[in-house]
């Protein structure tokens, strides 16, 4: 008889936080440009080991409002916020990453910080 595969109980799983951000730049940016910039900012500010521990993951970006969501490990939220703040240029265009807020769920993040930008 086969046994059921073991899984981690919720108390042992990694806890994530979601960061809402706005990109203010000289021109509108595409999703792929922002995704690459977030990853490169994480690597340059935190290094390979820090990025591996922080586990940044690009969730969504709205090209119309230039706002997006990034997932990060709970213990490394401030480090990723710092990395995004240090990002000043994307493909030769000056840019500012403005953190709108941090939440434990995407639903609450959209309701609290991204509703004014047309997110549902």
Swiss-Prot record:
GO biological process terms on file: tRNA 5'-leader removal
Keywords for this protein: Cytoplasm, Endonuclease, Hydrolase, Nuclease, tRNA processing
Disulphide-bonded residues: none
Primary residence: cytoplasm
Record EC number: 3.1.26.5
GO (cellular component) term, any one: cytoplasm
SUPFAM superfamilies with a match to the protein in the record: Rnp2-like (SSF160350)
GO molecular function: ribonuclease P activity
Compartments, as annotated in UniProt: Cytoplasm
Keyword field contains tRNA processing: yes
Residues spanning the membrane: none
Pfam family, one: RNase_P_Rpp14
Reactions catalysed: Endonucleolytic cleavage of RNA, removing 5'-extranucleotides from tRNA precursor
Primary role: Part of ribonuclease P, a protein complex that generates mature tRNA molecules by cleaving their 5'-ends.
HAMAP family membership: RNase_P_2
Record-stated family: Belongs to the eukaryotic/archaeal RNase P protein component 2 family.
Record text on subunit structure and interactions: Consists of a catalytic RNA component and at least 4-5 protein subunits.
UniProt name for this protein: Ribonuclease P protein component 2
Lineage: Archaea, Methanobacteriati, Methanobacteriota, Thermococci, Thermococcales
């Amino acid at each position: 008889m086969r046994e059921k595969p073991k899984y981690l109980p919720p108390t042992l799983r990694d806890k994530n936080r979601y960061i809402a951000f706005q990109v203010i730049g000289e021109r509108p940016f595409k999703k792929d440009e922002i995704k690459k910039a977030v990853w490169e900012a994480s690597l340059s500010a935190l290094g390979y080991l820090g990025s591996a521990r922080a586990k940044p993951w690009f969730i969504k970006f709205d090209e119309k409002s230039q706002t997006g969501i990034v997932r990060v490990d709970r213990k490394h939220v401030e480090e990723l916020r710092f990395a995004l703040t240090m990002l000043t240029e994307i493909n030769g265009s000056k840019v500012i990453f403005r953190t709108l807020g941090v939440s434990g769920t995407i639903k609450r993040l959209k309701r609290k910080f991204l509703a004014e930008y047309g997110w549902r």
